[in-house]
Amino acid sequence: MQTKVMTAKEAINSYVKNGDCLAIGGFVTNRRPYALVREIIRQHIGNLYIEGGPSGGDIDMLIGAGLVTAINTAYISNAAFSMVCRRYGEAVVQHKILNEDYSMDVQTIAYHGAALGLPYVPVKNMLGSDLADKWGISAEERKKHDKLPNQKFILQEDPFTPGSMLCLVPTPKI
């Protein structure tokens, strides 16, 4: 049997390409793939679409290197040093990256739905929230990027409970 063991340089060179959508795991400062992120930066692989739950300094490094086009995250912080990662905060305020924002629980449910092969997941906890109505990537901007879903969510009546609404959230295509 052939070994699959390889260096970070070989792995990134083989599996990460410009314009890829990357899901980066871990929680803020724990279990983050810093060595792989540094290798992405060394190889200058850009135009990345990042999916990350509660994210940390590794994604901030990619943003600082100018390699991120869009990010979908619930939270990004260097917990020991700041409430919000510096480069991420600057990039969002200066409109240098597209920023989609879901709550941590909705994002986790969406990842689970993606793992199950579902195109979307129904949730209730975004109903009436500013996350649903005011925050996120505009419809006009979404049309320019084939890696982004056409809409942040769709409101639909619950087919099992007439009169009750659901928020249909797209799952990431990773």
Question: What role is predicted for each listed range?
Answer:
Residues M1-I174:
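Conserved alpha/beta enzyme-core scaffold
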